[in-house]
């Protein structure tokens, strides 16, 4: 099964859910202040697959989300952001799909940090 087929379930989500997935990606990648090149490439691959009907580009949203996540991490509001993401994704993708997605994010560079594990665990507890 190729990469595109693995993420076929993303075709049916809303733009709102696409934004939540971008936020989640950035949060997981930056929660330990370490963003590897393979994580960046992997994130770009998934972002390219996300449905998008917003007037602004995905790239513009991505940049805005990076700034938002930086604030969230600085103010220790990770749980609040995860709750928002969970609420949005709850009706859009199944828990199994979310688990698959988060696993793919954190294993992109084969370095699974405690900080990443904590974020994923908190999100799964909300679903």
What are these regions (language model features)?
Residues 1-127:
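Small-residue-enriched hydrophobic alpha-helices in membranes
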């Amino acid at each position: 099964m190729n990469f595109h087929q693995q993420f076929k379930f993303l075709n049916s989500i809303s733009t709102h859910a696409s934004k939540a997935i971008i936020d989640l990606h950035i949060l997981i990648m930056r929660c330990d202040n370490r963003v590897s090149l393979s994580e960046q490439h992997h994130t770009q691959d998934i972002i390219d697959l996300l449905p998008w009907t917003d007037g602004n580009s995905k790239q513009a949203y991505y940049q805005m989300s990076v700034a938002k996540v930086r604030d969230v991490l600085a103010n220790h509001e990770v749980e609040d952001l995860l709750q928002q993401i969970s609420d949005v994704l709850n009706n859009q993708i199944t828990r199994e799909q979310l688990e698959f997605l988060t696993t793919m994010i954190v294993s992109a560079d084969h370095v699974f940090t405690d900080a990443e594990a904590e974020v994923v665990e908190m999100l799964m507890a909300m679903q």
